């Protein structure tokens, strides 16, 4: 059977009518990882329609890092969560109306979750948009919008060592110099694979 890929991200992009100074009252650092999953949370349950009200949401403010990432007196905020593989029939099974409804529902649930850290967040929103795993697939060409190459699910392990790098292919002089050369992938996997490729070529 085909190897499973890692879960994709759902990301909400917000433009806020709130200064960086005011935002920093709630977010002491630009990147916040609250660990507050609710009962019933299961990253492997693709049929849970209420998944986004149970998951933890990370927050990142680009404008707290660089104020030029928002107009003066305003701020930018990203909310992000890993999503079960092919959630809700892969976001509506190709039906654009269902896709839009699921996207809006997920967006509102994540904004509600972030409001526990930033009270009244909804009232400050001037702009909002979101990216689903299908969005990431369209722009990155990663299968199913995979966030870090292959699945991190320990039950779907296919490399002997999750941290090992395998750049070899059946094709002579063709090597894998990307995150796909390691089970857990990501930036560390891509760097390790590129390093191994350079060593092999030299």
PLM features: residue spans?
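Composition- and surface-driven signal marking solvent-exposed, interaction-prone regions
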Residues: 26-29, 71-75, 92-96, 126-127, ...
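A glycine-rich dinucleotide-binding beta-alpha-beta segment and adjacent secondary-structure elements
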Residues: 54-60, 116-183
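Mid-domain catalytic core of redox enzymes
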Residues: 1-71
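Charged, low-complexity, helix-prone segments enriched in Lys/Glu/Asp/Gln
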Residues: 1, 44, 99-106, 136-140
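C-terminal structured subdomain/cap of oxidoreductase catalytic cores
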Residues: 1-3, 7-21, 74-76, 82, ...
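Flexible loop/turn segments at secondary-structure boundaries
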Residues: 20-23, 66-68, 85-88, 133-136, ...
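Glycine-rich, aromatic-lined ligand/substrate-binding cores of catalytic
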Residues: 55, 67-92, 96-110
């Amino acid at each position: 059977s085909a190897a499973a890929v890692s879960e994709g991200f759902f990301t909400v992009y917000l433009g806020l009518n709130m200064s960086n100074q005011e935002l920093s009252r709630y977010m002491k650092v630009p990147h916040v990882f609250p660990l507050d999953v609710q009962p019933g949370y299961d990253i492997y349950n693709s049929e849970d329609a209420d998944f986004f009200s149970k998951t933890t949401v990370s927050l990142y403010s680009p404008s707290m890092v660089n104020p030029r990432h928002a107009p003066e007196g305003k701020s930018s905020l990203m909310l992000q969560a890993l999503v079960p593989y092919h959630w809700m029939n892969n976001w509506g099974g190709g039906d654009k109306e269902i896709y839009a409804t699921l996207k809006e529902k997920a967006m509102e649930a994540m904004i509600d979750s972030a409001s526990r850290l930033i009270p009244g967040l909804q009232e400050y929103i001037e702009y909002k948009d979101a990216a689903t795993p299908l969005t990431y697939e369209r722009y990155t060409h990663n299968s199913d919008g995979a966030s870090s190459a292959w699945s991190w699910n320990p039950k779907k392990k296919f490399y002997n060592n999750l941290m090992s790098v395998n750049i070899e292919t059946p094709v002579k002089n063709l090597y894998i110099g990307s995150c796909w050369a390691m089970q857990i992938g990501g930036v560390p996997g891509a760097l390790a694979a590129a390093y191994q490729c350079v060593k092999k070529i030299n």
